[in-house]
């Protein structure tokens, strides 16, 4: 099995993917029809759109720390949450996630990833600005 396909391995795989600049490893954690919520509230769907978002973050060349809060599975669905921190050039951004994963033949994969679920509007504006997005 590839990294991240066991439910408990998803969050460590995200941290490793960011810190090792492994775009392919990050995208491999998502189902083909997965959606991601951006800092400005926009929802993107599909692996190419998710790859583009991760590429933008990786281009910042920062360091990510991920602390898993929970992963609760029932049948073929799971709800997950982590607290992440991303630091680049002395600047720090962080949030709490809301995620849904679905059991696939190849293991657990994200179907919904909301990396900014725990952020207040003011925090989201700052995150969006630091990532080059101003629509919040």
Regions flagged by a language model, labelled:
Residues 1-25, 35-136:
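A beta-strand edge to alpha-helix "cap/lid" segment located at domain peripheries
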């Amino acid at each position: 099995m590839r990294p991240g396909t066991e439910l408990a391995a998803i969050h460590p795989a995200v941290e490793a993917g960011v810190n090792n600049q492994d775009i392919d490893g990050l995208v491999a954690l998502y189902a083909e029809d997965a959606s991601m919520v951006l800092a400005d509230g926009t929802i993107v769907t599909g692996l190419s759109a998710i790859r583009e978002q991760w590429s933008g973050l990786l281009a910042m060349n920062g360091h990510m720390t991920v602390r898993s809060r929970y992963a609760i599975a029932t049948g073929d669905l799971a709800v997950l949450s982590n607290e992440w921190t991303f630091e680049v050039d002395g600047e720090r951004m962080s949030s709490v996630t809301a995620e849904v994963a679905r059991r696939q033949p190849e293991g657990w994969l994200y179907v919904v990833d909301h990396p900014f679920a725990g952020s207040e509007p003011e925090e989201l504006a700052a995150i969006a600005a630091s990532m080059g997005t101003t629509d919040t």
